[in-house]
Regions:
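Nucleotide-activated sugar donor-binding and catalytic core shared by glycosyltransferases
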Residues: 1-217
């Protein structure tokens, strides 16, 4: 049923607006729906990899009450940070953007080149990996996806997603994808097809339930 999410008709327009804000020449890696403790792991692994300057990381914590906490974490590490809620334009020297706005998760995903879905590096069970697939973006996730296990396994089987063993592996996979536009495009096509082919789950469930509910009355 989680496949039946509504993608706004203007999602690409929203994404273009964010890309203009981020810088059209930047390669954008979105960390979506991250949970407590995951940002620190990802930042440490990302910085250790000494990434090229044109890679911009957009961090979107799962819970709004953690926005300030994550901003403080990044600042404490000396990271160049802009907050979505404050910035009219992101300087080219900025390494991280904190996605501290509400209702823009799909737009962040649509503006990404590569997406990592959080809640999966630590044993939280994962977050909704179908959202980035629905906007045609390559999706990555960690080892802990028990809340979305069937979707995660299906995404892997369809070539729409990649599973990382840990934060360092996630960074390595992301770097490979960011360096390979053709592979990103193919994964994005597969992700969109995967999401589209699984829509209609709610209608199918209702059709299955209807005669059974009628019999029970």
């Amino acid at each position: 049923i989680k496949f039946d999410l509504a993608v706004p008709v203007d999602i690409e327009e929203q994404a273009r607006g964010l890309r203009a804000l981020f810088g059209r020449d930047r390669r954008v890696w979105v960390w979506g729906s991250t949970r407590d403790g995951e940002e620190a792991l990802l930042v440490e692994a990302f910085e250790a990899a000494r990434p090229p300057e044109d890679i911009l990381v957009v961090v979107v914590p799962r819970h709004p009450q953690r926005f300030d906490e994550v901003a403080s974490l990044l600042a404490a590490r000396g990271a160049t940070l802009a907050r979505r809620s404050h910035a009219m334009k992101i300087p080219g020297s900025t390494r991280y953007v904190l996605g501290d706005s509400m209702g823009e998760m799909l737009a962040y995903y649509a503006a990404a080149d590569v997406v990592f879905v959080g809640g999966s590096l630590k044993p939280y069970g994962g977050q909704n990996l179908i959202e980035p697939c629905a906007v045609g973006r390559p999706v990555m996730f960690g080892p802990h996806t028990f809340n979305f296990e069937s979707a995660a396994e299906a995404a892997l089987a369809e070539g729409a997603g990649l599973r990382a063993r840990d934060a360092a592996h996630a960074v390595g996979l992301a770097m490979e994808l960011l360096d390979d536009p053709a592979r990103r495009a193919e994964m994005g096509r597969r992700a969109a097809a995967f999401a589209l082919s699984n829509r209609g789950a709610l209608d199918r469930l209702q059709a299955w339930l209807a005669p059974r509910l009628a019999i029970s009355r």
